[in-house]
Amino acid sequence: NEAPSYGGFEGQIGFLMATGGMLCLMPDYLGLGSSDDVLHPYIHAESEAESGIALLQAVEILSDELGISMNGQHFVSGYSQGGHASMALARRMQEDPDAGFPLAGAAPMSGPYDMSGTQVPIGMTLESYANPAYLPYLILAWQQTYGNLFVDLGEVFQEPYASALPGYFDGETSGWYIDNFLDGPTSDLVQPEALESMMMPGHPFHDAALDNNVYDWVPESPMRLFYCTEDEQVFYENALVAEAWMN
């Protein structure tokens, strides 16, 4: 119920951005808001991009019905996971010109653009993570998407977490509640050497991380990357990797 369509704080950001004369689109992620019958495919570049294109197509139809004129300029931005999603969408808009939505500019902010080389590896080196719920969220979401990360969640998490975690990601339990449940050193949550094994080249989890890197392309339209050096959730090195590749 914190999705933009519910009119909360993030929805108000959309209204603020629209005051500059922009037509602002703020989609609910799949699995959030009213689409609560599926686990949100967290940090999944393909579905993020496809959802963005589908929303643009829907708004194009609606604008015709309402008689709203648009000038054909499309700008993309987002923060944190939204930074990842906006980067995925910007890449799709550039690489698929037949979709009909040319990219005028993008401003991804503090996104985990380099999942395989930065976000996951740095997170694995920390004694504890600022928001520990993100780790099972990522693993469960990628398991739903790819289907081959593990046979049993107990391969990754120790008890009682392995048995309890799937029930917590029900669309009703808040992130802070899951964070409190997982509060403690990462070594107390996961099986010994499980994360290191999953990040070995050739492991399905590592392959999924590679599949969801969104930095390895060169924008043909203006892009500005924003990041926070004290970000405890999405490490700022993601932006530095993206900048180095794109330049």
Stretch-by-stretch model annotation:
Residues 42-65:
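Alpha/beta-hydrolase active-site loop
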Residues 28-32:
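Short beta-to-alpha linker loops that shape the active-site pocket of alpha/beta-hydrolase fold enzymes
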Residues 243-247:
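Catalytic histidine neighborhood in serine/cysteine hydrolases
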Residues 76, 219, 224-231:
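Short beta-strand/loop motif that positions the catalytic acidic residue
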Residues 109-216:
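Accessory cap/linker subdomain of secreted extracellular hydrolases
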Residues 218, 232-240:
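Conserved alpha/beta-hydrolase "acid-adjacent" motif
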Residues 1-21:
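Short, surface-exposed "cap/lid" segments of acyl-processing enzymes
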Residues 57-129:
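Primarily recognizes the serine-hydrolase "nucleophile elbow" in alpha/beta-hydrolase
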